[in-house]
Amino acid sequence: MKRALHVFLVGVVGLSLGLLAFSIVPTKNNAVSAKATAVALQPGEYTVGADINPGRYTVTPQNGSGNFYSDPKKSSGSSLNEVLGTGDPTYVPSVTANFKKGDKVKMEGIPSVQFTPVTKRNKNNTTMLGAGIWVVGKDIKKGKYQVTPGQGQSGNFTVEPKSMFGSSTNEILGDDTSAGQVPKINATLRKGDTIQIQGMSQVNFSKK
């Protein structure tokens, strides 16, 4: 009887320790991940996750103008190539995008660049977007739109569908038709589609 009781107690203790160990193992659901944090950077090359916290940022030059690049770690990611600054129609005053761990960021010719975390996104927007990478349903409402560049501006406008059966869009918006630019396009934006605007500080959307 004493031997049976001893075996039973050992089993109970072992089970309790096992449950305790299981309960404190971190899981993906309760793990804390780093949040986007404001930072100012000087010309050079940086790695997201080492020099910049991963997250969504609006990037602006604090003074001057120059080149801003980003190169995604994953081949499926989108790259950025903008001239940040003001005072020239080919410059953009800011660019907004997600920066993921392992992505490379490079600045040239700009004394200082400010990364400001995006804290709010306007899913009900139906009117305007600037340079950067945007998601339908998070930054603009889904629907049919007529899309036009801001006054006197030109640049690339692309839409990558979320669905493999969706249609992509790749146009150069602008008034110079002799250079292959188009002054307006009609686009159907579906939830989850990704929009990229390059070289333009403003693109106008008119819901149809």
What are the roles of these predicted feature ranges?
Residues M1-V12:
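N-terminal Sec-pathway targeting helices
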Residues L15-I24:
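Hydrophobic alpha-helical membrane-insertion segments, chiefly the h-region
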Residues I24, K28-V32, T60-Q62, E108-T127, ...:
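Short loop/turn and low-complexity linker motifs enriched in small/turn-promoting residues
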Residues T47, N81-F99, I133-V135, N170-R190:
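Beta-sandwich interaction modules
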Residues Q62-S79, Q151-S168:
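Short, surface-exposed beta-strand/strand-loop-strand elements in extracellular ectodomains
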Residues D103-P111, N186-N204:
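Short, exposed beta-strand-loop hairpins at the edges of beta-sheets
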Residues H6, S23-R56:
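N-terminal, intrinsically disordered, polar/charged segments of Gram-positive cell-envelope systems
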